[in-house]
Amino acid sequence: GQVMMAQPLKSCLDAALADSAVPAPRRRVIYLSPQGQTFTQAKARQLKADYDQLVLVCGHYEGVDERFIEACVDEELSIGDFVLTGGELGAMVVTDCVCRMVPGVLSDTECYTGESHWAGRLEYPQYTRPETWEGRTVPEVLRGGNHAEITAWRTRQSLERTLVKRPDLFRETPPTPDEQRLLDKIRRDRSRPQLTEPPVCRPAAADDLPAILAIAQPARQYLRR
């Protein structure tokens, strides 16, 4: 297969940096490569904090001459373990993720600091109008107007979603003591038996004893926790 030559790439890089007023320590040349470090939100934050200029080099065909990477590239980044035709889509992902944290790009920092992965947690569920849609209703706490209760609900939902869908994120960003206490409560609540049918009220009979004991034993273990 074809390989991109080193000198044309070097000439393009020199042209891109020719008019740059950014000092070298604040510049970063990144090659989008399947062999690179996996790009994450944490990496995006680090790039935004440490550098004022990013030059993204997009490979094509079989890749680029290794000598160009050795001489000119500061680091390699990958957006995942899959194959693309070229590095352009990866460059767009990096550009969007980093630029949205630049002041003025979005109207408010809250536009991105509360989203999934920002703090190593998944975002809480979102709702809008109407209040009821196809039999599904917006949670009552969100309709009550109590901001403290809404914040508490969002925190719990964020932790529970992360626990269920992406528990690996807790290894990367360990829970705080407050989060750990809430996670313990979430686990206890999720382990409780859930009623699938309305309860039937009637006097107990002798043949109900095995079923009663079957319920009592796990209940006893739960109360001992």
Predicted regions and their residues:
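S-adenosyl-L-methionine/SAH cofactor-binding core of RNA-modifying enzymes
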Residues: 2-60, 66, 103
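Conserved beta-strand scaffold positions in the cores of enzyme catalytic domains, especially
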Residues: 29-31, 76-78, 201
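Residues within well-ordered alpha-helical secondary structure of globular protein domains
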Residues: 15, 156, 186, 215-218
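Internal, active-site/partner-interface "lid" segment
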Residues: 89, 101-141
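A short beta-loop-alpha structural element at the N-terminal edge
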Residues: 200-214
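SAM-dependent methyltransferases
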Residues: 130-198
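Structured adenosyl-cofactor binding patch, chiefly the S-adenosyl-L-methionine
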Residues: 64, 68-115
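Conserved GNAT-fold acetyl-CoA-binding loop/helix
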Residues: 213-225
